[in-house]
From Swiss-Prot:
Cross-link (Glycyl lysine isopeptide (Lys-Gly) (interchain with G-Cter in ubiquitin)): 115, 208
Modified residues (Phosphoserine): 110, 177
Entry keyword RNA-binding: no
Compositional bias per record (Basic and acidic residues), positions renumbered to this chain: 253-263
PTMs per UniProt: Proteolytically cleaved from a C-terminal extension in the course of the conversion of the proteasome from its latent form into its active form.
Main location: cytoplasm
GO cellular component: centrosome; cytoplasm; nucleoplasm; nucleus; proteasome complex; proteasome core complex; proteasome core complex, alpha-subunit complex
Residue positions with a glycan: 110
Species for this entry: Rattus norvegicus
GO MF annotation terms: lipopolysaccharide binding
Descriptive protein name: Proteasome subunit alpha type-1
GO biological process terms, semicolon-separated: immune system process; negative regulation of inflammatory response to antigenic stimulus; proteasome-mediated ubiquitin-dependent protein catabolic process
Pfam families: Proteasome, Proteasome_A_N
Length: 263
């Protein structure tokens, strides 16, 4: 992307009716590591790919606990996600103290949409550079919502965001009809297979780089990390080998894809 006279502030429209600062924020989501969300009739599942800043650093948390019935996975700027997560936790606490009931998932997503819309309209502010997948369970059943830096939000049956997420969305679209009838183990496996599609051919899912969040009927939101992920990965079949492109010469190394930013 190249700078132009219409991207100096979020309040400036281009002649084509675009707000470039918002588009730049949405590009930040595409640079974050991939995450997948999907649901059945009884459960909602989040599966996220964790990334370490360096070999000396621990892997960043990609799935965050909001309330007993809600959790989120993030792609983009972690600092922005932490701020939004704290806001969501406060709203859930307010609902429990004031109304003595858990906050409905759709209501919480609406509040997030209102909060993220404010920086897109005021001078001197910038949009939040993070996308969220929100999984929850309430009286209406399981939910998976996607939020964007543009303040749009969508109710989804399955969704993936982050780097190389198009490959995961292709898998989800291909198996969409199976999700509603799946039990919990099968649903998690579908999420892991979709997430695996975002990885380069030489990499695979491990207990170190995968995090899983599950919520559902009679099951509070639970995050599985490290060794807790092993039972789910053990039941996953080996990754099929991708065929080499016929047009690529055997003696020429494959071009290295652009590495996404560390988010």
């Amino acid at each position: 992307m190249f700078r132009n006279q219409y991207d100096n502030d979020v309040t400036v429209w281009s002649p084509q009716g675009r707000i470039h600062q918002i588009e730049y924020a949405m590009e930040a989501v595409k640079q974050g590591s991939a995450t997948v969300g999907l649901k059945s009739k009884t459960h909602a599942v989040l599966v996220a790919l964790k990334r370490a800043q360096s070999e000396l650093a621990a892997h960043q948390k990609k799935i965050l606990h909001v309330d007993n019935h809600i959790g989120i996975s993030i792609a983009g700027l972690t600092a922005d996600a932490r701020l939004l997560c704290n806001f969501m936790r406060q709203e859930c606490l307010d609902s429990r103290f004031v109304f003595d009931r858990p906050l409905p998932v759709s209501r919480l997503v609406s509040l997030i949409g209102s909060k993220t819309q404010i920086p897109t309209q005021r001078y001197g502010r910038r949009p939040y550079g993070v996308g969220l997948l929100i999984a929850g369970y309430d009286d209406m059943g399981p939910h998976v919502f996607q939020t964007c830096p543009s303040a749009n939000y969508f109710d989804c049956r399955a969704m993936s965001i982050g780097a190389r997420s198009q490959s995961a969305r292709t898998y989800l679209e291909r198996h969409m009809s199976e999700f509603m009838q799946c039990n919990l183990d099968e649903l998690v496996k579908h999420g892991l297979r979709a997430l695996r599609e975002t990885l380069p051919a030489e990499q695979d899912l491990t207990t170190k780089n995968v995090s899983i969040g599950i919520v559902g009927k009679d099951l509070e939101f639970t995050i599985y990390d490290d060794d807790d992920v092993s039972p789910f990965l053990d039941g996953l079949e080996e990754r099929p080998q991708r065929k080499a492109q016929p047009s690529q010469a055997a003696d020429e190394p494959a071009e290295k894809a652009d590495e996404p930013m560390e988010h």
